[in-house]
Every structure is written in structure tokens, then in C-alpha cells.
Amino acid sequence: MTKPIIHETANQPQAFFWLLILILVQFLFYFKMQIDGYFYTKNQCDEPRRRAWSSFEVAIPPGYAVHGIDVSHYSCKIDWEEVKRMNSNGIQMHFAYMRATRGLNLVDYQFSESWQTAEEAHILRGAYHFYMFRDNPVDQARFFLSHVPIKSGDLPPVLDIENDLDVNDRKLNRDNILKDIAAWLYIVEKQTGMRPMIYTNLDYYKYYIEGNFPAYTIWIASYKSKGTVVLPDNRHWSFWQFSDKARCNGISERIDLNVFAGTIEQLYALRKK
């Protein structure tokens, strides 16, 4: 006798249900970690802290006339007048970049205040977006633009490409990632009338940027390089983040310190007209 064919589908809805539960738990855990870290930093920043230093406390690469910082909510509340006044062995801060947004759901809670008060202190300012590989690039661009009121005198917007937790899972989709990055850059340039810059570290530069986006200004992060930093394809860089351990008056936390490979006049020329 031929046995009847039995389709064992009874367990499929149950398996799908538990898969959804697993995905939801992972998402909630990730979201909780982000929120906990965010409010832990915010609570720390609410405490009074020392914001006066005798020097930058890091070795400054010689031969560069223009210096600046980049900050986020991890830098806590900033006294931009003190940042402007600091002078250590003739070195002053000429520009500051501030994280505005990350991915699709995080607006840096210090951004709005820093954006305004840095301008009042007559520090050249710029905003950057921390790119998340798993999020839609078009939506990320619109999210960034909706929170950054770029106007005449501001430095170009920056796309920060680094250390996304998901990047190792998506390396097989490198071509898609490059298309996504290009989409973000295109939308922001079209909306602001300014060509964005690309910030990245040497590892991400080698994997994603080398040989791509030749028309875009490069801001490279490298803490081990001495004197200067050389990109693997010898491409010119315009900004170099050489330390993440610097001190600066007006800021309680250690910060990122940068040099600009040009004159102050060339930096001014980058501003929005």
C-alpha cells in the first residue's frame, strides 16, 4: 500500500514564532545597551568636572598651522569660549566638528547647544553623521539634514564611516555598501550645495574608500602615525585625526585632536558661501 504523503507543516508557524521572538530579543538588547550607555554618559556629564588644562597633553605633529577638535555627547558640556581662548605653545583650535546624528534614531543631545555656542565663540563649525551600515542611506541622509541647520560660513558636512557593529556581517556586500555610501553623499550634497567629506580610519579606508570616491575630501584617523600619515594609495588627505586622548580648556573629557593640511585661508575657503 502506498503511504499517504504527509506535509509536516504543523511546526512551521511555531518555529517562525520563536524566530521572531529571538530577533525581537536581540533588537531589544541592542537598543537597551545603546540607551543605557547614552544615559550613563549623560548622568556623568551632569556632574561638575575640571575643564582647565595647562596643555593638550599629547604630542602635536609639527609642521601644521591649523588645528581643531571633534566632539560628541561623550565630551559632555563644552565651554566654547574657553576652547577658543586656549593657547599652548602657540597652538590654538581653529575649527570644531560635532556629531549631529547616528543612524536613524540618535540625535546627539549636546549637538544643538554646541552648534549654537561654538558659532557665538567664533569657532569654525561643522557637523558629522555616524553612518550605520544596516540603516537605509537615504533615510540616514534625510535624518541628518533634518537636524543640522547648515548656513553660510559653516564647514562641509562629514560622513563618519567606522566601527559599525554590523560591518563584519556585511563585508560580502561591499559593492552594496559603496552604493549606499554614494547615495548618502549625493543627497546631502544636493540638499546643502556642499560636497561632504569622508571621515574614516585606515582599516575602513583600505576596505571601502581606497580607489573610490576620488572627488571627496578625506579625513583620516590614525593614532600610531608619527609626523604624518600616508594613505595606502598615496591619496591626499585634508584632515588628520592624530589623537583621541587630548585635553582642551573648556572640556572635561579627553577629546579627538586634528590637523588640517593647509593654511587657515584654505580652511576658510571650504566654508559654505
PLM segments and residue spans:
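N-terminal Lys/Arg-rich, disordered targeting/topogenic segments
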Residues: 1-13
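Hydrophobic membrane-insertion alpha-helices, especially the h-region
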Residues: 14-34
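Sec-dependent signal peptide cleavage junction
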Residues: 34-40
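Functionally critical loop-and-helix segments that line ligand-binding/catalytic clefts
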Residues: 41-75, 81, 205, 213-273
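Substrate-binding cleft of extracellular glycoside hydrolase catalytic domains
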Residues: 47-183, 189-191
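Glycine-enriched alpha-helix->loop->beta-strand junction motifs that scaffold or abut catalytic
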Residues: 88-93, 123, 153, 212-219, ...
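Catalytic domains of cell-wall/extracellular-matrix polysaccharide-remodeling enzymes
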Residues: 155-233
